[in-house]
Amino acid sequence: MLEVPVWIPILAFAVGLGLGLLIPHLQKPFQRFSTVNDIPKEFFEHERTLRGKVVSVTDGDTIRVRHVPWLANGDGDFKGKLTETTLQLRVAGVDCPETAKFGRTGQPFGEEAKAWLKGELQDQVVSFKLLMKDQYSRAVCLVYYGSWAAPMNVSEELLRHGYANIYRQSGAVYGGLLETFEALEAEAREKRVNIWSLDKRETPAQYKARK
């Protein structure tokens, strides 16, 4: 009978242990996340990019997407509440006018910003770079849509079209694009596009502070 070298079972154990630790990490990019709270903390720490199908536009800077893992398609019959089967994303670095909520009148251009965003994103598959999770358990993201070869940044487009100003409150994140955002905001303001056409204007932050 051949004697098995002592290092072989040790190697087999080490390989098995390594695979046991590695496989869960390899599976995560292909796992579907039902809510933002399902997304691992390290995905935010490393600013991972995910993708999903837009199923609802809440307002000009908030959407709900059904996460679509890489190598999967966006089709499928999903049942259940949107709050339990979708990710709520807050578009990073911008603030759109508030829409009417809870019996309170909305701001000028709030509905227009929402309608524009819905026209651009509804039922589309988008990619989104995770920056942070906010106090409302929303994923604050840079959202991209359109051609894979020349994707458009939602934050930039909202600023370009005068449907948002730069978000400058506590906890603001820009994904390294603040200078770009400032240039786009300044250009829209100079052209008096949409929100910048108003002679007297209240920012969304000022509006919310009046509650």
From Swiss-Prot:
Which segments constitute the TNase-like domain?
48-198
Record entry for activity regulation:
The nuclease activity shows a general salt dependency with a clear reduction by magnesium and sulfate ions.
What sections of the sequence does the record tag as coiled-coil?
A: none
Annotated localization:
Secreted; Host cytoplasm, Host cytosol
Leading EC class: hydrolase
Q: What is the active site of this protein?
A: R90, E98, R138
Instruction: Indicate the secretion signal residues.
Output: 1-20
Q: Extract the InterPro entries matched here.
A: SNase_OB-fold_sf, Staphylococal_nuclease_OB-fold
Q: Which residues bind Ca(2+)?
A: D77, D95
| Region of interest called Binding to the host cell surface, as start-end residue ranges on this chain | 200-211
Q: Where is this motif: RxLR?
A: 48-51
Main subcellular localization, coarse class? secreted
EC no. given is 3.1.31.-
Tell me if Calcium is a UniProt keyword of this record.
Answer: yes
How is this protein annotated for GO cellular component? Answer: cytoplasm; extracellular region; host cell cytosol
Q: Which GO terms describe its molecular function?
A: endonuclease activity; metal ion binding
What are the glycosylated positions?
A: N153
Q: Provide the alphabetized UniProt keywords.
A: Calcium, Endonuclease, Glycoprotein, Host cytoplasm, Hydrolase, Metal-binding, Nuclease, Secreted, Signal, Virulence
UniProt entry tagged with the keyword Zinc: no
Substitution effect: R210A: Impairs host cell surface association and translocation into the host cell
Q: Which family does it belong to?
A: In the N-terminal section; belongs to the RxLR effector family. In the C-terminal section; belongs to the LCL3 family.
What is known about its subunit structure? Interacts with the host cell surface endoplasmin gp96, in order to get translocated into to host cell. Interacts with the effector Htp1, in order to get released from vesicles into the host cytosol.
Function, in words:
Effector involved in the disease saprolegniosis in salmonids and other freshwater fish, resulting in considerable economic losses in aquaculture. Within the host fish cells, Htp3 is released from vesicles into host cytosol where it degrades nucleic acids.
Domain-level remarks: The conserved RxLR motif does not seem to be involved in self-translocation into fish cells. The C-terminus (residues 200 to 211) is predicted to form a short helix with charged amino acids and is required for the self-translocation into fish cells.
Name of this protein:
Endonuclease Htp3
In its UniProt entry, the species of origin is given as Saprolegnia parasitica (strain CBS 223.65)
Ranked from the top, the taxonomy reads: Eukaryota, Sar, Stramenopiles, Oomycota, Saprolegniales
